[in-house]
């Protein structure tokens, strides 16, 4: 049994040594995919916003807007559960013995996850959120499911949540720093803060049912959006943790990492 285990570990170590430390293709493809997708969404809004998005009782509204809502919600829920399940199913069950080079490679993979997560947060919590405020300051709503809400609340928010949970689960199941040494407060805040913006949508829409107010972040009803949004600054804490671990791995393992030995 020990011979088999030793042979398997030797083969794994050889495969790790051949794998590049950083593969930028997933990061590039993820960035391009998100940006192209949202540019397409923005063009769709431009074409069908005024044409079919002003009267929720019109059949065009159901055709061009409610159909999107009916499709995106189950797709996002399934994606969330499938990603969490896959990350857990394929987790590394021996994090205490991850090779230094492999751990470094996984750190770079996590950085790619975080960068794509940041891009998704920009589109959802910044671009489409500001757009939503502009829409509702110029158009009188007759439904909570306005065109801008269908894109902002029920598309862009769940999308960055799915990407965020992917990165969080990757860290918890692949990296010893996050998976076998307790919980990282910084990473928990980085994921939970933006995530909590989504359930806060319910409070926001309930409030708008009773009060008419300008779509400004200084309005009390919108304070929690800002509060949870600022949690994204925890990315600096996560960055410091990752950089600290990179320094630890590099010290004394230069030959494994493909680095020049320190003089």
Which functions belong to the PLM regions below?
Residues 1-92:
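N-terminal topogenic module of multi-pass integral membrane proteins
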Residues 2-34, 100-116, 174-189, 242-243:
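Alpha-helical transmembrane segments and their helix-start/interface "positive-inside/aromatic belt" motifs
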Residues 35-37, 184-263:
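C-terminal transmembrane-bundle signature of multipass membrane proteins
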Residues 37-57, 90, 123-138, 198-211:
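Membrane-helix interface motif
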Residues 54-72, 137-153, 212-228:
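Membrane-interface segments at the starts/ends of alpha-helical transmembrane spans
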Residues 72-135, 167-168:
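Internal transmembrane alpha-helix with an interfacial aromatic "cap," most often the third helix
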Residues 73-85, 150-169, 230-233:
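Generic alpha-helical transmembrane segments
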Residues 116-182:
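Membrane-proximal helix-loop-helix units in multi-pass membrane proteins
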């Amino acid at each position: 049994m020990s011979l088999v285990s030793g042979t398997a570990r030797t083969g794994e170590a050889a495969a790790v040594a051949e794998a590049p430390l950083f593969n930028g293709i997933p990061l590039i493809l993820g960035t391009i995919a998100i940006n192209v997708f949202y540019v397409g969404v923005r063009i769709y809004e431009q074409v069908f916003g005024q044409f079919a998005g002003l009267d929720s009782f019109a059949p065009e509204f159901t055709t061009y807007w409610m159909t999107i809502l009916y499709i995106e919600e189950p797709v996002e829920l399934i994606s969330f559960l499938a990603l969490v399940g896959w990350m857990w199913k394929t987790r590394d069950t021996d994090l205490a013995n991850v090779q230094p080079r492999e751990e470094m490679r996984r750190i770079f993979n996590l950085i790619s996850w975080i960068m794509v997560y940041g891009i998704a947060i920009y589109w959802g919590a910044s671009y489409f959120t500001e757009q939503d405020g502009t829409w509702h300051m110029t158009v009188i709503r007759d439904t909570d499911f306005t065109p801008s809400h269908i894109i902002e609340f029920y598309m862009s928010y769940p999308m960055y949540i799915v990407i965020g949970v992917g990165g969080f689960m990757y860290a918890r199941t692949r990296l010893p720093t996050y998976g076998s040494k307790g919980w990282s407060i910084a990473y928990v805040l980085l994921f939970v803060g933006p995530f909590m913006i989504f359930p806060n949508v319910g409070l926001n829409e309930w409030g708008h049912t009773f009060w008419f107010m300008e779509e400004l972040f200084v309005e009390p009803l919108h304070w929690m959006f800002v509060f949870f949004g600022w949690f994204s600054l925890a990315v600096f804490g996560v960055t410091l943790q990752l950089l600290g671990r990179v320094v630890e791995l590099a010290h004394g393992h230069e030959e494994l990492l493909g680095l020049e030995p320190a003089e």
